[in-house]
């Protein structure tokens, strides 16, 4: 018997991407609600409970409702919304976050797919906090830019309609209430809420996250090489991971980084830039906001949960 996969919300941006990634998978059976029954709660409940894994690509409240409709103890859930990312009983679906995280996902019945914005900063900050190079109360700011697909269908339609007239750089989240802050704080092991100041660019997908560090106030100031080594050692210990750390020796010669280099993949690349004389560093991560940042991570988590 092939595992049955139900994508609740398969017609949204993330749902469509997941459906496309699974289209050629002969080892799975994708089940879908007939078009005429899509708005029926009873139909959703029927398909949720018929699935081996239900992938929820819904707004937070709708995702919570879907979970409440599941009465089949064998149905596993991957939730792509923010509803359960720091909830008790849910495994966080960033498999490379820790060397035991893939196992935690594989054995979980409930997995919260990460948001696109926190994954890069978690990848760069968590190894530094756990190694003691950065204190948990270090003041953190996250900057970056992503493709407009991160804003969902309304933003996609707006950017496509405007074409070359669309904004090249559009900051948002200016109220300092970004919905991804709680998971970033929790999984980067920070003791205070970081500032998250994202922006959207006039390109469809791909993203760069940037964490600038002013290190001069620390009692023991780490060098760039020490920061890089801690991050590189962290990911070297994770077997089968999809996060690559750029060699430190190459970084002096890199004038720029393209946010679209990993589009269409589930990979991430991490960079550490530093000026030791100024006690400053930049932690960068590049990945596809629709890949490792959303649908690619969901499929990776699904495979772990199925033992594939």
From Swiss-Prot:
Q: Which InterPro entries match?
A: AGPR_type-2, NAD(P)-bd_dom_sf, NAGSA_dehydrogenase, Semialdehyde_DH_NAD-bd
The protein's GO terms of the molecular function aspect are:
N-acetyl-gamma-glutamyl-phosphate reductase activity; NAD binding
Stretches of the chain forming a coiled coil according to its record:
none
| Active site annotation, chain numbering | 116
Q: What pathway does the annotation place this protein in?
A: Amino-acid biosynthesis; L-arginine biosynthesis; N(2)-acetyl-L-ornithine from L-glutamate: step 3/4
Q: Record's GO cellular component, any one?
A: cytoplasm
UniProt keyword annotations, A-Z: Amino-acid biosynthesis, Arginine biosynthesis, Cytoplasm, NADP, Oxidoreductase
Entry keyword Zinc-finger: no
One short Pfam family name for this protein?
Semialdhyde_dh
Kindly list the biological process annotations in GO that this record carries: L-arginine biosynthetic process
Chief place where the protein resides:
cytoplasm
Q: What is its EC number?
A: 1.2.1.38
Q: Where in the cell is it found?
A: Cytoplasm
Quote the catalytic activity from the record: N-acetyl-L-glutamate 5-semialdehyde + phosphate + NADP(+) = N-acetyl-L-glutamyl 5-phosphate + NADPH + H(+)
Purpose of the protein: Catalyzes the NADPH-dependent reduction of N-acetyl-5-glutamyl phosphate to yield N-acetyl-L-glutamate 5-semialdehyde.
* Entry's family note: Belongs to the NAGSA dehydrogenase family. Type 2 subfamily.
What protein is this chain from?
A: N-acetyl-gamma-glutamyl-phosphate reductase
Source organism (scientific name): Mesorhizobium japonicum (strain LMG 29417 / CECT 9101 / MAFF 303099)
Gene name, Swiss-Prot/TrEMBL: argC
């Amino acid at each position: 018997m092939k595992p049955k996969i139900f994508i609740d919300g398969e017609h949204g941006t993330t749902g469509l991407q997941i459906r496309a990634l699974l289209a050629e998978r002969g080892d799975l059976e994708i089940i879908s609600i007939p078009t005429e029954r899509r708005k029926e709660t009873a139909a959703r409940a029927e398909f949720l409970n018929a699935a081996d894994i239900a992938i929820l690509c819904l707004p937070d409240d709708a995702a919570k409702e879907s979970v409440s409709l599941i009465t089949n103890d064998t149905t596993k859930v991957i939730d792509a919304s923010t509803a359960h990312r720091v909830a008790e009983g849910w495994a966080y679906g960033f498999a490379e976050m820790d060397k035991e995280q893939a196992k935690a996902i594989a054995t979980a019945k409930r997995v919260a797919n990460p948001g696109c914005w926190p994954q890069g900063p978690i990848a760069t900050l968590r190894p530094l906090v756990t190694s003691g190079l950065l204190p948990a109360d270090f003041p953190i700011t996250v900057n970056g830019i992503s493709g407009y697909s991160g804003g969902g269908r309304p933003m996609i339609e707006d950017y496509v309609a405007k074409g070359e007239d669309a904004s090249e750089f559009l900051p948002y989240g200016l109220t300092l209430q970004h919905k991804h802050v709680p998971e970033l704080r929790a999984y980067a092991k920070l003791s205070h809420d970081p500032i998250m100041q994202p922006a959207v660019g006039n390109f469809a997908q791909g993203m760069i996250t940037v964490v600038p560090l002013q290190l001069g106030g620390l009692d023991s100031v780490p060098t760039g090489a020490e920061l890089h080594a801690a991050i590189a050692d962290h990911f070297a210990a994770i077997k089968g991971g999809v996060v690559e750390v750029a060699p430190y020796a190459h970084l002096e010669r890199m004038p720029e980084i393209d946010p679209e280099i990993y589009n269409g993949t589930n990979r991430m690349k991490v960079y550490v830039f530093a000026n030791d004389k100024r006690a400053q560093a930049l932690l960068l991560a590049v990945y596809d906001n629709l890949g490792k940042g959303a649908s690619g991570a969901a499929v990776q988590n699904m495979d772990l949960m199925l033992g594939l």
